Amino acid sequence: WFEIHSINTARGECFFYILPDGTTLLIDAAGANPNDDELEGHGYPLAPAKPSGDISSSQVIIDYLHHYLPEVSEGKIDYAVLTHYHGDHMGVLTDDMPTHEDGGFTICGITDVGSRIPFKVVYDRGSLYDRPSKNSFSGATPKRYENYLKYIEWSSKTHGTERRSAVAGAADEIRMIHSPESYAPFSVRTVASNGNVWDGKEDRSS
């Protein structure tokens, strides 16, 4: 089976995948307070936090993962993918959020999840300043990105986490690692990354 789990906290994106051999993949892990100004600033009404405002969205994600992680994962996530550096995908930052005692990064969203359920490999779009937008130099995005880098540095030293940049067209980034020979036809391909899109021809992109 290939399992797709959508973890709905009403505070941003989070998807959890279990590949046929038990390899795990987490895409995004948003986090925000129940009444967050940054998310409200997009002009859309916020849905009520799920299951309630009494628990952080990252804690909801962590609890869900602990329940569904397959035994073969040994309590870790094989691959995490951070699609981009916006708060509704990686977690927003506010002054009242706690700081990780050892790593010095703010605990929220993907940094909260990754500090409590180790990631073996993290894929992202690469540097915030590669093909930048106006958000790369203003607002909360640079602060979120620098906080993410602090987390990556700590997790690399503590858990051996590898940070990699996703490549459009690549079919060898997310691979089954437990018993791939049992599910040979199955594969995962990166279709787009950082402005590049797979052109449908082997591993090339444009």
List the model feature ranges, each with a label:
Residues 1-3, 64-67, 72-79, 90-206:
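Flexible, acidic/histidine-containing loops and adjacent segments that form or flank the divalent-metal
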Residues 1-79, 206:
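Conserved beta-strand hairpin/beta-sheet module of binuclear metal-dependent hydrolase folds
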Residues 10-13, 31-34, 85-89, 128-131, ...:
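Solvent-exposed loop/turn segments at secondary-structure junctions
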